[in-house]
Regions:
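Hydrophobic transmembrane alpha-helices and immediately adjacent juxtamembrane helices
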Residues: 1-276
């Protein structure tokens, strides 16, 4: 346990404790009911199988130079991470408001960005079985890998996680400020499959849609992960996409920071934390 003295002397340790504590607590909450443990693997496997069958029926054996199952596997990874982040980090403040704990969140010395990210990490930990189940199904259905540079693949996967967490952090404040967080979150679920290139290559989307795709960090991360894990790209070759992912993610972090500050400012000015 970190004492108040240690908190003052070691703020990094305090933030780390808040991050891990939040992630652990949210994981325990999600793991309470058995249905929560099997929902993600079943849902994501059905989603993968649906798209795999659809591509098979149209006679496609490759997508963007990669096997259909391999392409969809990377998209499923992105889908798992995005789905977990959207309903955890994105709804962190909204959940606290709904549960009546927003006062504790805003008045405590805990770092609110760490709380928001902690929710996302807890949800990702809960979704871990889904990664393995979908990966097994993908391999059995013909996924082929060509990994030359493990470091490049690791950086791409790290970018996928960081990019989705950055989106969740940005959405946390935006959902509150919009006063219609649930509606926005629901609207974002399906379009992201296409905008981020999870189920179809970005190059096949209409030209006017592609700028919106490039504005998402997960788009660049998914492309980089496919390049490194399926096409044998090295760090140098996939570097532009990896850098683009982290660069766009940084912009989302800035947006999240100012939107969170706005929520705090308005709440303090009004003298109540349940303003929204």
């Amino acid at each position: 346990m970190i004492t108040s003295r240690e908190t003052v002397l070691n703020p990094l340790a305090h933030r780390w404790a808040v991050l891990i504590g939040t992630a652990r607590a949210y994981f325990v909450i999600l793991n309470t009911y058995a249905i929560q443990r099997i929902r993600n693997p079943i849902t994501l496997t059905i989603n993968f199988a649906t798209w795999r069958i659809a591509y098979g029926l149209t006679g496609h054996h490759q997508i963007a130079g990669a096997s259909v199952s391999g392409f969809l596997l990377i998209g499923s990874f992105g889908n798992i991470i995005w789905f977990s982040t959207l309903w955890s980090s994105g709804f962190a403040i909204e959940r606290a408001r709904h549960e009546g704990t927003s006062a504790a969140l805003f008045l405590s010395p805990a770092s609110r960005p760490m709380v928001i990210v902690g929710y996302g990490l807890g949800a990702l930990a809960m979704a871990t079985p889904a990664f393995f189940v979908v990966a097994v199904v993908a391999v059995l259905s013909g996924a082929h890998f060509y990994l030359v540079d493990p470091l490049a693949a690791f950086l791409a996967f790290a970018g996928l996680v960081a990019g989705t967490l950055a989106c969740g952090f940005a959405l946390a404040g935006i959902f509150i400020l919009s006063r219609r967080g649930n509606i926005i979150a629901t609207l974002l679920q399906m379009p992201i499959y296409f905008l981020a290139g999870f189920v179809v290559p970005i190059s096949r989307l209409p030209v006017w849609v592609q700028p919106f795709s490039n504005a998402l960090p997960v788009t660049h991360a998914a492309i980089a992960l496919r390049e490194t894990a399926l096409l044998g790209y090295t760090t140098a070759q996939a570097g532009p996409q990896i850098l683009a992912c982290f660069g766009v993610a940084a912009v989302y972090c800035i947006v999240g920071y100012f939107s969170l500050r706005r929520v705090e400012h308005v709440a303090k000015y009004a003298g109540q934390l349940d303003l929204y």
